[in-house]
Amino acid sequence: MLQVEHLTKIFKSGDQEIIAINDLSFSVPVGQFLTIAGRSGSGKSTLLYQLGLLDIPTSGKVLIDDVDMVPVSENERTAVRLNDLGYIFQDYAILPSLTALENTVLPLLMQGYTIAQAEAKAKKALEKVGLLDRINNLPSQLSGGQQQRVAIARAIGHDPKVIFADEPTANL
């Protein structure tokens, strides 16, 4: 389960403080979806960065399976990010010199999978997003929507407990 308690994120710019997230609390049970909607600049991406442990909130808790991730060490947060979380970023930035398969395999290798394991998981993920027939294509040979699906395959390849998606269908 993902649980957020009194989450606040304040950015400082000189003498000014910009409150991006103010005392937010909610929980998302296992197997459930949560959609966050709001206008541009309302803090949606900032919230995802806090939830995904890519940034530290000013105050509050982010609990994954009842463990508060805010006070743990950066090494522990990195391990959770690599093993338990999947990310689909608004600007997905797949690597232009790698094929769809290689782009999907790379994060799995970083997580410690063998090449054979990583390729099998990557092919399964690419099949789920309908790109098994394009695994040898470079990003320049894929449409924007297909590139977005490679990013989705990367996010789901290791069967994460939680997936964070920032406008995941923007290019589809």
Tell where the protein language model's regions lie, with residue ranges.
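ABC family nucleotide-binding domain
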Residues: 1-172
